[in-house]
Amino acid sequence: MPKVVLASRAHKADSIFLREWLVDAVVPALERSGACAPWAGVECFIPALPPATATLSLEPTVIQNPKRFLRIVRFTRVHDFAVCAVARDAGCCILVEFTPHCVSNFERRYHQRITSSTVNSLFVIGNTSLLFYARSDAAAAFEVPALMNGSSTLPVLRVGDCAIFDQDQVESHRRFPLVQEHPRFVQSLDMAMQGSVLSRYT
């Protein structure tokens, strides 16, 4: 008799630490940036990680903050020692740039490339800025041509520090939209752009 795999056990469940937070954090940041400059961003969007220790997974400041967690979906480009990727929370994806400093520290800590066997792994991040890229700049920087067909402004996380929280490579067959495709982001960006146009005539 063929072996039957129950649907509930066909795929590993996602981590309980990975929650939906990107939209709730990015949209208010866009709204606060002002009508005249919706691309201003937030320099200290996520604070630095505590000093690396063997008990990082037990650090309260890490596990109690949902904004610390992202799962790597894919890497898109390595350029000038910076590594570009797409990562996600439990609901949406976002473009991520790991700085050269971040990449160097990661590779010294784990003795491996940041791109080696880490796709679908759960990362914790810190020292992270939120940037807003123009569509053409994002498509070029991340080498994702499909970005040219979407929003005129794209949120990007520039990560200055990261660590592996769980290296189990949990792959989901669900489609996770990019943050800029979410209705709340689209609405907030439209309002910001309308305010920018009006401000030129007042």
Swiss-Prot record:
Keywords, in A-Z order = Chromosome, Nucleus, Telomere
- Gene3D superfamilies assigned to the protein according to its UniProt record, in alphabetical order: 2.40.50.960
Q: Which InterPro entries match?
A: TPP1/Est3 (IPR019437)
Keyword Cell wall biogenesis/degradation assigned: no
**UniProt main location, coarse:** nucleus
- Per the record, what is one GO cellular component? telomerase holoenzyme complex
Coiled-coil residue windows:
none
Q: What GO biological process term is on the record, naming one? A: telomere maintenance via telomerase
| Record localization | Nucleus; Chromosome, Telomere
Select a single GO molecular function from the record's annotations and give it: DNA/RNA helicase activity
**Pfam family of the protein (one):** TPP1
Could you give the subunit structure recorded for this chain?
Component of the telomerase complex.
Task of the protein:
Component of the telomerase complex involved in telomere replication. Stimulates RNA/DNA heteroduplex unwinding which favors the telomere replication by the telomerase.
Concerning its family, UniProt says: Belongs to the EST3 family.
Q: What is this protein called?
A: Telomere replication protein EST3
Q: Per the UniProt entry, what species is this protein from, by scientific name?
A: Eremothecium gossypii (strain ATCC 10895 / CBS 109.51 / FGSC 9923 / NRRL Y-1056) (Yeast)
Biological classification of the source? Eukaryota, Fungi, Dikarya, Ascomycota, Saccharomycotina
